[in-house]
């Protein structure tokens, strides 16, 4: 009897502990249930990952521990290496002018706006940047997105339906392909830069309401330039629209950096221009569409990534305003990129390497073919102080692995020569060149 009385006194003291243990039991049971349900999926994923590794196409992520520049440091080493694989074409990613402009925007407009554009996410800075970009490209109007991927994803669905046709180059960027898949238009694909095939499709689709020819201005994996004059001529002949992505040309390609339309002599003949601020324009984030005022107004009403994504941060907008202002005040920035490009291409070709792409474009793919060879080649280049990456399937077609080098205005001629010297040493060591 006394024992029962003592137990009644002690029991309330253990009640909180019991509740804690019971709660932990429930959480563990829940976790075990999730693990069991996901085990089959994880097993299948691990098999897929093993297959990728066995094929030599698994993509490791090297960790950079410095600012993006011509010289960087990589995790695991304090030694600086030369970076020849960034989209930092104009060398502005670490520009003191852009950093200062971003700081000023932080002070004046804050860190973020916590809103989409049509609620309370549009500032005077956003409107100023849109005006600058439209002026830079010689277009009527511009609409900003969080990224060019969003700009491409939100364009076609808003404008075209089943009465229309979207006619796309077969090697267009993944973001373009995804954007086209989202729309209800009839979809056609022409062989890469094949104008006869494009004309065949234009002839077949003359009964449709609108036809839109869609192409990258410069193709990112090969560095080749779309034949925009021929495309525009066909568009005029068959009453079609022309849409281009200028991500790998705006700001640095063409005499004054106005991109592929300037390089090909078709300024004023392009209906829609999409591009990014994440490459030559400082390398941060942001994308856009330039078009007529009517098209841009419709995109503001119907483009889903624009309507349902947070507005671009003020610091990014402030830096971008500075970038476009600099480009419109001076045309000298692209000149250094071109000089570095010609030096690299001339020396590499003379050494016996096979390079893809246009002679004037800073994307200089060194073609190797085998995926495992491309990965090994890149690793040996890093040992020699040159940071490059091997590209293989599914980023590029099977059997067309390469090291995609990219020249920058941040590189000195001496650094470009060091890069070529390393390529020659590794190329001879691995039997790529004699």
Region locations from a protein language model:
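Conserved PLP-binding catalytic core of the aspartate aminotransferase-like
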Residues: 92, 335-345, 349-385, 395, ...
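Short, structured coil segments at secondary-structure junctions
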Residues: 162, 182-184, 238, 269
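N-terminal "arm"/small-domain region of PLP-dependent enzymes with the aminotransferase-like
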Residues: 4-6, 10-30, 37, 41-111, ...
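Conserved N-terminal alpha-helix of the aminotransferase class I/II PLP-enzyme fold
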Residues: 100-148
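Conserved PLP-anchoring active-site segment centered on the Schiff-base-forming lysine
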Residues: 155-174
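Active-site phosphate-binding strand-loop segment of PLP-dependent enzymes
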Residues: 88, 188, 192-244
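Active-site C-terminal subdomain of aminotransferase-like
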Residues: 238-241, 248, 253-360
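PLP-dependent enzyme catalytic core of the Aspartate aminotransferase-like
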Residues: 2-28, 96, 100-104, 108, ...
